[in-house]
Amino acid sequence: MAFKKKFAPRRKFCRFCADKELPIDYKRADILRDFITERGKIIARRITGTCAHHQRVLTREIKRARQMALLIYTATHSSDVKKKSIL
């Protein structure tokens, strides 16, 4: 017996297509942080809802921001933080 979904999932939309004035720039780290995890990984477009074009641009700008040290490459491990606090 198959169960029907009670509701349809909300369709995701590209934030940058909806707002043409919103720039994707490596200097705008506050916007770029919305598209990376707390561990520093880039979130997939099927999760964020961005279109293919803007996901490519977003990935390029995140990588530029990492090189300029505006964003982190990876998060520090909690075990590393504990070791430093003991010493």
UniProtKB/Swiss-Prot annotation:
It comes from Nitratidesulfovibrio vulgaris (strain ATCC 29579 / DSM 644 / CCUG 34227 / NCIMB 8303 / VKM B-1760 / Hildenborough). The gene is rpsR. The keyword Secreted does not apply. NCBIfam families: S18. One of its GO terms (molecular function) is structural constituent of ribosome. Disulfide bonds: none annotated. Binds as a heterodimer with protein bS6 to the central domain of the 16S rRNA, where it helps stabilize the platform of the 30S subunit. Keywords: Ribonucleoprotein, Ribosomal protein, RNA-binding, rRNA-binding. Part of the 30S ribosomal subunit. Forms a tight heterodimer with protein bS6. This is Small ribosomal subunit protein bS18. Belongs to the bacterial ribosomal protein bS18 family. It holds the Pfam family Ribosomal_S18. GO terms for cellular component: cytosolic small ribosomal subunit. One of its GO terms (biological process) is translation. HAMAP family: Ribosomal_bS18.
